[in-house]
Design a protein with these regions (language model features):
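A short acidic (Asp/Glu
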Residues: 150-154, 173-176
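Gly/Ala-rich beta-loop-alpha elbow adjacent to hydrolase catalytic centers
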Residues: 142-147, 151
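Short, surface-exposed basic-aromatic patches at helix termini and helix-loop junctions that form
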Residues: 153-161
């Protein structure tokens, strides 16, 4: 067994990097995220059934000073993990009312105006630690809103696979640093590894996006609903896209924004 202390803040080995792969249907991600942070399972330890996986909360990471927050979800049957990076706090609802909101806005503005994102080093440590864990056989990333910056960064730096929505993009300087001298190759790998779910009316993305959208963009139906930059609107749109794709109207009793199966 691997000593857990050896997993902290280290350079991933080739065997660890080989764990990076995609397994989840990207359209299931907004519903999963909404249930995890804002839905009926937000205060529950119950596992979530998504696309044949039973994902339980394996580990939580929360760094109040930088605002970094999220979960490592794990399917015990396969060892596949989803590392979910949380988006911006909501006023009156989360982490100290407005305090968390101001922390998050500070991080977004710092990233947008070139003074750096203080969450990135913390996220880097959390990700490399997860890669090292023996229980984690494979892993992919999920990022919403400001969490999308982190997922984009880790995908470009390490070759991780990710699904992002409410996508804030990636700072051009970070893309250049981790492109290893070949921007076009880095952009191609990012398009191959990142799916970016988009609602055309998301004004927060337009106002606070920090840089280039590096993933392959999938435009969801009902784009104007995105003006409120809420994960539930993305979940509704993604569920509609699933029904359109699969040629069904949805099951009786289907709950708006649910992760699905």
């Amino acid at each position: 067994a691997v000593d857990s202390s050896a997993c902290r803040a280290h350079e991933p080995t080739p065997l660890e990097l080989a764990k990076q792969r995609s397994a989840i249907d990207p359209l299931r991600v907004p519903g999963l995220y909404s249930e995890l942070f804002h839905g009926r399972l937000s205060d529950s330890s119950a596992a979530m059934s998504v696309g044949g996986m039973r994902l339980r909360r394996h580990k939580q990471f929360d760094h109040t000073d930088s605002g970094l927050s999220g979960f490592v979800l794990l399917d015990d049957a396969t060892g596949h993990a989803l590392m979910v990076f949380k988006g911006m706090d909501r006023p009156f609802a989360e982490r100290g009312s407005w305090a968390g909101v101001f922390t998050d806005l500070g991080v977004v503005l710092a990233a947008k105006f070139g003074t750096g994102n203080s969450q990135l080093p913390r996220a880097d440590d959390a990700y490399t630690e997860a890669l090292c864990e023996e229980a984690v056989k494979s892993i992919e990333l999920v990022g919403y809103s400001m969490g999308s910056q982190i997922a984009n960064y880790l995908a470009v730096k390490y070759g991780a696979h990710a699904v992002v929505f409410g996508d804030m993009g990636l700072d051009a300087a970070l893309l250049k640093i981790h492109a290893r001298g070949n921007l076009e190759a880095a952009r191609k790998e990012a398009r191959d590894h990142i799916v970016s779910l988009s609602l055309s009316g998301d004004l927060v993305v337009k106002a606070f996006g920090v840089g280039e959208v590096v993933g392959t963009v999938v435009n969801l139906p009902g784009g104007l609903n995105g003006v409120f930059h809420q994960p539930e609107f993305y979940a509704d749109a993604a569920n509609a896209a699933i029904r359109n794709r699969d040629g069904v109207r949805g099951r009786d009793g289907e709950r708006t924004g649910q992760a699905g199966t």
